Structures are given as C-alpha cells and as structure tokens.
From Swiss-Prot:
The gene is rbfA. Pfam families: RBFA (PF02033). It comes from Chlorobium phaeovibrioides (strain DSM 265 / 1930) (Prosthecochloris vibrioformis (strain DSM 265)). This is Ribosome-binding factor A. Monomer. Binds 30S ribosomal subunits, but not 50S ribosomal subunits or 70S ribosomes. One of its GO terms (molecular function) is ribosomal small subunit binding. The keyword Cytoplasm applies.
C-alpha cells in the first residue's frame, strides 16, 4: 500500500467511526471500524467492522450497514469532499478476528483444564 492510500485509509477509518457513532447511534451491539483497505485507484474502500454481540445482532448490524451504505457515503462525502475529488465507493465487511481470538482462548482454557485434571 502506498503512503497516499495509507493516509486515505486512515482518514476514512476515523471518519467512518465518527459517522457511525454520531449519525447512527444504536442501542445494539458494540460496533468498531477496525480497518479500512482502499484500492490503488482510490475507487473502492472496504471497511472492516468488529461487532461484539450475538450472531443475530451481528447479522442485523451487517444488514443495516449494507442498507445504509449510500447514506453513509453521502455523509462521508460532505465531511471530506474538500480533500478528495472523488469519494470512494464503500463496502462493509465483518472482521471476525475478535470471535476467532475468543474461540482460541476458550480452547486453550479447556486444554489447560484437562491437563490440570489429568496430572
């Protein structure tokens, strides 16, 4: 990733986080923009979001984000239009790293428990 795309991705991550926090306050699961990856031509930005909640809440939140993508992009455009000629298309993807880490911790705990019981 070039220096420019890194700067753009960082700015988009900050702005998307602020938009989701201020413009779309929800009483549901905790939602965090973890990372934004942007194509070299700055035409597409993939925002990876971490959603802490149960399976149903995560599915509803992803559906909400996908339904609101155009509105979120419009709000984003109004905030950063003076910095870019063209605002990238947005795509939201769920970042499952937190869930995977929790599962690994759970497995490690069970292994420790079993090895402690067998000794």
């Amino acid at each position: 990733m070039s220096r420019r795309t890194e700067k753009v991705a960082s700015l988009l991550q900050q702005e998307l986080g602020a938009i989701l926090e201020k413009e779309y306050p929800r009483g549901g699961p905790l939602l965090t923009v973890v990372e934004v990856k942007i194509t070299a031509d700055l035409g597409l930005a993939r925002a990876f979001v971490s959603i802490i909640g149960n399976e149903e809440e995560r599915a509803e939140t992803m559906e909400f984000l996908n339904d609101e993508t155009k509105n979120i992009r419009r709000i984003l455009s109004s905030k950063i239009r003076h910095q870019f000629r063209r605002i990238p298309e947005l795509e939201f993807r769920e970042d499952l790293l937190y869930e995977k880490a929790s599962r690994i911790e759970e497995l490690l705990r069970s292994v420790r428990k079993e090895s402690g019981e067998n000794e």
